[in-house]
Amino acid sequence: MTRAMYMSKLYAPTLKEDPADAELASHRLLLRAGMIRKEAAGLYSYLPLAWRSIRKIENIVRDEMDAAGAQELMMPIMVDAELWRESGRIDAYGKELVRFDDRHGREFVLGPTHEETVTALVRNELRSYKQLPVNLYHIQDKFRDEFRPRFGLMRGREFIMKDAYSFSATQESLQEEYDKMKQAYANICERCYIKALPVVADSGEIGGDTSVEYMALADAGEASLVYCDDCGFAADDEAASTKVVVTEGPGDGTLTKVETPGMGTIEAVAKFFGFPENGTRKSLALIDAEGKPVVAIVPGDHELNDCKAEHVFGKGYRMMTDEELQANGLHKGFIGPVNLPDGIRLVCDESLRESKQWACGANEVDYHFTGACPERDFTVDEWADLVTVVAGDPCPHCGKPLSAARGIEVSQVFQLGTKYSEAMGATFMDEDGKEKPLIMGCCGVGVSRSLAAVVEQHNDEHGIVWPVSVAPYEVAVIPLDPKKEECTTVCEQIVDGLCAEGIEVVVDDRDERPGFKFADNDLMGFPYQVVLGKRGLKNGTVELKDRATGEREDVAIDEVVAKVAELVKAARR
């Protein structure tokens, strides 16, 4: 038995116009439908309708985590900064980490993740292999001081996450936990009606060497990914790696200096030589994290990938300023590997290793070389994976052309290994009585982000189209003349019947025009609408509308409860 909500009492202030700063459909519709309100940049209040959906997502997450053998707990939001110093992350995390002193001068952080906290929690308790594996999770507000919060709930400064942490004695046990979490996340996405793709991902500041993200496909998603239709490979652009096919540059293989007046761009040089941009080499002048000069070279039609570059040059690397270019003897638009000034490290993309005929800058204004050959004409200090993989590049598994898409990261699973346990002294005794570091895994589900992902994938020109499993209410009962006794009597009969069936019902009992009610209910997106109109009541029927398909049918008053209950229960996951 459920209890109905009446819109005359519901706090859901809808908006007629789109908010000016809302870029994504999910941001725009959640604001317009009276579900969230912005308090400050990246900070939102969840109003009653959104909070009901959030709770449903949380319960789906709990159900799947519990089924996978994980145990729920709760850890504090405030974390002693000393734990972050133990792990070595306090400075590496950067300005996104919210840090502050309490009244006693002790430093704390607001947890964006809780690896340090959970490691400290178990390090004096999990001391034997007999106690392992253990998987602990919590659902909590997290904090990250984003430089540019945007996209509503997609990239906020405060957000709701489910984080789980596994502790194992062996790599095989870690893999088992990892596989269970991947399956749990696939189940969560399916039950929330989120169309998501598991993709190979970079582990970032959390660490570890193996990670999979679940990306909700969305044209307006903030993340880029590539995938193969033939073999199923998928990866985000931070982790996607393949051998880019490159074209040899113009010329006969002899190092030749060519005058190229004013041609300081890849496009201009390629046009001048009558060659595709892929046949040129793009040289980028950088300052690495240690403040040392570097030139990175990639195929002319590809871009330097920021995440990959951080792995090679260190977090905080940057492009050279004009002053630094001059100080290092470099000329913007004409930089190349031949005759590179002394003291500059040369790093080239792995895809260029076999290429023997480069078109590149000559390190002299208005000149380029053709026929430049590695080792013969210049020495490469390091070959590395530097480029962003794009549509058309070969799949690293089967060689077929990759496709590109955009997505929203809703969850991620990591194999952390011993990064935190070694740094923080979390050890156990194995079967042979030897002390070893705990082997850790972690995984996170963005609960508030999942809410936005559902809306991003389920909407139309009229508003949100909630799937039943996460809808704030499953059925809207809309009496068009709530002041008439006949209408009120039938309305109460239907509402009582639906509530008795355990259906979640909202009743639009407001004294408003029918058009206003229809527009508001379509905007809020309840899966089914039962409309009580004057003409239908005379005929002993009500109108049943499926919000997702727009289909309408007249149903006898004494049959509508059974029909709606059947539809809703079949659609629940």
Residue ranges of each PLM-predicted region?
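NTP/phosphate- and nucleic-acid-binding module
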Residues: 1-573
